[in-house]
Design a protein with these regions (language model features):
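Extracytoplasmic beta-strand/coil segments of soluble accessory domains associated
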Residues: 71-108
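Transmembrane beta-strands of outer-membrane beta-barrel pores
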Residues: 157, 174-178, 204-208, 245, ...
Length: 375
């Protein structure tokens, strides 16, 4: 009797297990049809690592100059000599600042005196994009000089863009901060015709550079002093004309920068004041023209003239601890470039570029060699 009940219960259990297993298998074996998803993307032609800041990201940065924005890139070393009024350079992959090419609207900035570009004099108020390459630019269609950089920084200024109901844009800003910083700026963009527009950007920077510090004297009392001769007066102005043509564009840019600044130094013989001064004037005028002649041939022309002036003064009559130095440097540069691109196949382009550059450097130093260079 007990054995019959046992086998009946065992049979019912096996039947229920088989029923549940078949039900589970039916759920697992059911088919669900999903609609197809098509993913499209452009082929990335950047074969060299690139980092870029543009648009809203650039405007939201708590930065004043291009050097401050480049701090957000990886793999770079920023050298800042003296805050707002000091020289600011960048070092990419430990190649040195002399091997970094800085390009403003596609044309390289030069310095025949020491080969170093001060990034602190380029403001972000009129900047559209800042791009950094760990080498040359990936594009094949570029001037010959662009192929010879161990590291490249491309600064792209704003190009006016207007809505249909707008013929001009005006942007005024005012910034202030510690150490007596006053920084107003104005940007005006005007639509001259359907294909021609103009822009004017001005900026003024002033700071006293004064701040308190503690000076300890051996065998005496600590003294609270104020750093002096750290003031900066800087004016930047640039204007541009922009034109659109069929399958191309042209643009012309004029840039002017003038500054006077003091150089504070160490406390020597209990003297807290330093009278070293420096005056800088930088001007350049450049033009670019680009046009595609069908799908086979493209032409790019660049031209530039630059003039740079530097005056450094250290007067021992005002500061006994210094040697008299009164040096002036004047340099000029002329640059011409022509790039040609021929498209043989969709996957094969040929670029032929030729550049010419003339540099001249003068100074008031004794036995100065007065270098000239044609490249």
């Amino acid at each position: 009797m007990f054995g019959q009940i046992y086998f009946r219960v065992l049979g019912i259990g096996c039947f229920l297990s088989m029923a549940l297993l078949s039900s589970a298998q039916s759920k697992l074996d059911s088919l669900h049809h999903l609609n197809e998803v098509v993913v499209t993307a452009r082929i990335n032609k950047e074969v060299i690592p690139v980092q870029s800041l543009s648009g809203d990201k650039l405007e939201k940065l708590a930065a004043h100059s291009v050097a401050d924005a480049i701090r957000y890139f990886s793999g770079v070393q920023i050298k800042d000599y003296g805050g707002i009024g000091g020289l600011k350079t960048v070092n990419i992959r430990s190649m040195g600042t002399n091997h970094v090419g800085v390009y403003y609207d596609g044309i390289e900035l030069g310095n025949a005196q020491n080969g170093v570009i001060d990034l602190g004099r380029f403001s972000l108020d009129n900047m559209e994009a800042v791009t950094l390459y760990n080498g040359q630019k990936s594009a094949i269609f570029q001037p010959a000089k662009d192929f010879g950089s161990a590291g490249s920084i491309y600064l792209q200024s704003r190009t006016p863009v207007f809505r249909e109901d707008r013929a001009y844009h005006v942007k005024a800003t005012f910034k202030t901060g510690s150490f007596g910083v006053v920084n107003p700026s104005l940007l005006w963009e005007q639509k001259l015709s359907e294909n021609v527009s103009a822009s004017l950007s001005t900026e003024y920077m002033y700071t006293t550079g004064k701040y308190k510090f503690t000076y300890a004297v051996d065998g005496g009392y600590d003294t609270t002093a104020v750093r002096r001769n750290g003031d900066v007066n800087a004016l930047r102005a640039e204007g541009g004309l922009y034109g659109k043509i069929k399958s191309g564009y042209w643009r012309t840019k004029a840039y002017f920068y003038n500054s006077e600044r003091g150089y504070p130094g160490a406390v020597v013989r209990n003297r807290f004041s330093h009278e070293d001064r420096q005056w800088d004037t930088n001007f350049f005028f450049q033009s670019s023209f680009k046009k595609d002649f069908g799908d086979v041939y493209s032409l790019l022309l660049n031209a530039k003239y630059a003039y740079d002036y530097l005056h450094y003064l250290a007067d021992p009559q005002k500061e006994e601890a210094t040697m008299y130095v009164n040096n002036t440097y004047r340099q000029q540069e002329v640059y011409l470039s022509m790039a040609n691109r021929v498209t043989l196949f969709p996957f094969w382009d040929i670029n032929i570029s030729a550049d010419y550059q003339w540099n001249k450097l003068n100074a008031n130093l004794t036995d100065f060699p007065y270098p000239r260079r044609n490249t």
